UniProtKB/Swiss-Prot annotation:
It is found in: Cytoplasm. It catalyses: (R)-4'-phosphopantetheine + ATP + H(+) = 3'-dephospho-CoA + diphosphate. Pfam families: CTP_transf_like. InterPro entries: Cyt_trans-like (IPR004821), PPAT (IPR001980), Rossmann-like_a/b/a_fold (IPR014729). It comes from Thioalkalivibrio sulfidiphilus (strain HL-EbGR7). Its cofactor is Mg(2+). This is Phosphopantetheine adenylyltransferase. The lineage of its organism: Bacteria, Pseudomonadati, Pseudomonadota, Gammaproteobacteria, Chromatiales. One of its GO terms (molecular function) is ATP binding.
Length: 159
């Protein structure tokens, strides 16, 4: 049986912490689906198509990775993908409470699914998409935190 993991998120934009999680997941699973959530309630900085494109660029060197956009219930998307594992990243203890609640809700909605938590490499443990956007908006260098295409997209959008 092929084991498929889905790594859902807004990825606004995808960071090197995200790509670190995906890279390590490719060694654990037959296929990793990076599911870029529409997340209209979060009012994303980049639209869904832009976020999918940036994620594809950042992950292009990984063979068993697919990037796709989605909206709606994650449990439904998981079934559509025939996936067994929800992959989530934990940067700090502060992330755990929210992630624990999400895992419990997903277990209730789809008991056949498992949630697996991975932590990023130490150098990315403090990186978040919102911090990257804030630093970029203030004219800071974010090239250590995101890929070249993301740096270019941030500069183009922010002027």
């Amino acid at each position: 049986m092929q084991v498929i993991a889905v790594y859902p998120g807004t990825f606004d934009p995808i960071t090197n912490g995200h790509t670190d999680i995906v890279r390590r997941a490719t060694r654990l699973f037959d296929r990793v689906v990076v599911a870029v959530a529409a997340s209209p309630a979060k009012q994303p900085f980049f639209n869904l198509d832009e976020r999918v494109g940036l994620a594809r660029d950042a992950l292009s060197g990984l063979g068993n990775v697919e990037v796709t956009g989605f909206s709606g219930l994650l449990a439904k998307f998981m079934r559509e993908q025939q996936a067994q594992v929800i992959l989530r990243g934990l940067r700090a203890v502060s992330d755990f409470e929210h992630e624990f609640q999400l895992a419990g809700m997903n277990r209730h909605l789809a008991p056949e699914l498992e949630t697996l938590f991975l932590t990023p490499a130490e150098e990315f443990a403090y990186v978040s998409s919102s911090l990257v956007r804030e630093i970029a908006a203030l004219g800071g260098d974010v090239s250590h935190f995101v890929s070249g295409p993301v740096v270019a997209a941030l500069k183009a959008r922010m002027g």
